[in-house]
Amino acid sequence: MKFVSMKSRGGDYLVVAENVAWLRTHENGQTQVGIVGSTPNLVAGTIEETAATILAG
């Protein structure tokens, strides 16, 4: 299981990379991260930056 650290304006998340289902652009330069079996997390950064963070793990 690989955890990825994601920055958020309200606090940081440790997300299991394998549980990321989708990414969606949100307002103010943020991205929604869809999590399998959960509600989406709102993280700081563009969709490209978020994808790169997940892939770099």
Predicted regions mapped to residue ranges:
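Acidic, Ser/Thr- and proline-rich intrinsically disordered linker/docking segments
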Residues: 1-57
